[in-house]
């Protein structure tokens, strides 16, 4: 009887150990599944992190490129503003210079015209300014007690022989030829200046106009 009870107790222990082993194997299986799932999820997370890092890297590269482009544009605009200001100052200086030259030219012309008027009265000579500078045309009036003598002249400006002959004739009539020649010379200068094309100062050739400044951004040709 004692032997039977001992065997029954042994079987229960063996059965309990077997059931415990079954439970442990089941728990181990569940644990392995959880570990596998965790590792799988961890791998997915790592891949997602890598994808995110790649995106962040690309975004950082774009941000860096945009920042460099913005810095270049800011630098370009600063240079452009400086160039515009320098051009504005050059243009103002040139306008003042041209204004000053025009004023001096008017003053000189007035002085010449006054001198011409004086010489015209002194020599009694009236020059046809419309004929100049191609021709020397006019009339010299010799005042007389009874009547005045008119000496008209109409010569090609390049006719040196004719002009010399005219001067000799006037000199024979007691006309101050040096003043007469000075009168014709001044009238010729006025006529040539009036017909000469207006040329800007030499500085104007080196002065860049505002509209000629390259307004293309240095970053506009980036790939």
UniProtKB/Swiss-Prot annotation:
The keyword Transmembrane helix does not apply. Keywords: Cell cycle, Cell division, Centromere, Chromosome, Coiled coil, Kinetochore, Meiosis, Mitosis, Nucleus. Residues 51-116 form a coiled coil. It is found in: Nucleus; Chromosome, Centromere, Kinetochore. The keyword Cell division applies. Signal peptide: none annotated. It comes from the Eukaryota. One of its GO terms (cellular component) is nucleus. One of its GO terms (biological process) is cell division. Belongs to the SPC25 family. Component of the Ndc80 complex, which is composed of Ndc80, Nuf2 and Spc25. Acts as a component of the essential kinetochore-associated Ndc80 complex, which is required for chromosome segregation and spindle checkpoint activity during meiosis and mitosis. Required for kinetochore integrity and the organization of stable microtubule binding sites in the outer plate of the kinetochore. Participates in SAC signaling that responds specifically to disruptions in spindle microtubule dynamics. The NDC80 complex synergistically enhances the affinity of the SKA1 complex for microtubules and may allow the NDC80 complex to track depolymerizing microtubules. This is Kinetochore protein Spc25. It comes from Drosophila yakuba (Fruit fly).
């Amino acid at each position: 009887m004692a032997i039977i009870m001992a065997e029954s107790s042994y079987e229960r222990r063996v059965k309990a150990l077997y059931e415990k082993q079954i439970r442990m194997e089941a728990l181990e299986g569940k644990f392995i599944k959880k570990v596998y799932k965790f590792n799988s999820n961890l791998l997915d997370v790592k891949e997602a992190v890598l994808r995110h890092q790649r995106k962040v890297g690309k975004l950082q590269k774009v941000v860096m490129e945009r920042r460099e482009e913005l810095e270049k544009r800011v630098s370009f605009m600063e240079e452009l503003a400086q160039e515009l200001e320098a051009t504005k100052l050059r243009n103002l200086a040139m306008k003042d210079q041209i204004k000053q030259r025009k004023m001096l030219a008017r003053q000189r012309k007035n002085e010449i015209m006054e001198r011409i008027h004086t010489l015209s009265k002194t020599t009694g000579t009236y020059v046809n300014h419309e004929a100049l500078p191609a021709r020397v045309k006019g009339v010299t009036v010799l005042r007389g007690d009874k009547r005045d003598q008119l000496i008209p002249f109409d010569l090609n400006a390049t006719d040196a022989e004719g002009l010399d002959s005219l001067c000799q004739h006037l000199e024979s009539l007691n006309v101050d030829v040096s003043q007469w020649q000075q009168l014709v010379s001044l009238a010729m200068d006025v006529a040539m200046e009036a017909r000469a094309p207006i040329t800007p100062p030499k500085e104007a050739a080196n002065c860049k106009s505002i509209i000629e400044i390259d307004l293309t951004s240095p970053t506009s040709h980036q790939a």
